[in-house]
Amino acid sequence: MRILVIGAGTMGRGIAGACALAGYETTVFDADPDAQRAVRGHIESSWARAVEKGKVTAEDADRARHRLKIAERLKQAADSDFAIEAVPEALDLKKMVFSELDDLCPPRTIFASNTSSLSITRIAHATGRRDRVVGLHFFNPVAVMPLVEVVRGRETSAETESRALDLVRSLGKEAVRVLDTPGFATSRLGVTLGLEAMRMVESGVAEAADIDRAMELGYGHRMGPLKTSDLVGLDVRLSIAETLQKELDSDRFAPPEILRTLVAEGLTGRKAGEGFYRWQGDKPAGEGKRSAELARRGRDVATELARKK
C-alpha cells in the first residue's frame, strides 16, 4: 500500500516515519522547498535515536529508509491508497489541499486529515468524494504516543472508517472512534484542562511544575496539563481553543492572556525550546523564564487585590 503525507512539519514527519517503519511505501510532500530538503534528515535522525534506545532494529530502520520518498511536486505522489494531510490547523488551507488532491488522486484514494479540532465534514466538502474522507488525529510525538482518534464525518462511509481503523492498528497504534464534533474527544477534554491550568498559573494559584505534579501524583496522569501543552505546541493549543470558543460559543475555551503572550513571543513549548518549561530535547529542564515572569506578575496583582478587600 502507498501512503502520501502532505506536510513536513513535526506531525507530518512523525506520521511518515511511522508509516515507513510499518512497511508502507511512503512519500512526503511539502510546498516549502526548505521543508522538503530537511524532512528526510529529521525522520532518519528520529529512527537513529529509536535504534539507540533499542525500540527499533537497525535493519528495520534501514528498510524504512528505502521506503521513504520525498516528492518535489504533489502530482508525483498522487497515485496513493491513503493521502494523510498534516498541514497547519487552518480550515481554508486544509480545504485547498484536499481540493487539489481530489483533482490529482485516483478514485480509490482515501483522504485523511490529522486535524485536532476542525470539522472533517467541512473539509470533505472541498472534494467530490465525501464518503472517502476521514479524520486521523495522531498525537505528538507520533513515535511515542500510542493513540489515534479516528473521526467519522457526516458522510464518511463505513468502509472508509474500517480501512482507517485497519491502517491505525497496522502502525501499532490504538484507535478510538469519535463523531465529527468540535474538538472531537481528546482536544475538547485536553484543552479544557490545559486552559484551566494556565489560568491557575496566571493568577498565582501555583507554579506550573506544582500543578503538573498535582495531576500526575494525585490523579495518575502520565503527564501534567502544562507539560502536555508544551509538547503539543502552545500555538496549536491557542488555535484549538479559539476554534472551540467559536464553534461551541463557550467562554470556558477563551484563551488566557499568558497563552496569547507566549505564542506572540514565539515561546511555543518544546519545539521552540521554551514555553511553560525550558526544554532540552524532549525533556523539560526547569520552568520557562518568560512564563514564570508572567506568573509572578499575576501573583502580585492577585496579592494587591486581596489586600484591598
Predicted regions and their residues:
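Amphipathic alpha-helical segments at domain termini/boundaries
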Residues: I3, L21-G23, D62-F82, R163-G172, ...
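Rossmann-like NAD(P)-binding element
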Residues: A35-A38, R49-F111, L118
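Rossmann-like dinucleotide-binding cores of NAD(P)H-dependent redox enzymes
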Residues: V28-A61, V150-E161, A175, P182-G190
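Rossmann-fold dinucleotide-binding core
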Residues: I110-D180, F184-R188
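NAD(P)-dependent Rossmann-like dehydrogenase/reductase catalytic/cofactor-binding core
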Residues: A22, R169-D180, E202-S203, A208-K309
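NAD(P)+-binding Rossmann beta1-loop-alpha1 motif at the extreme N-terminus of oxidoreductases
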Residues: M1-R49, K53, L104
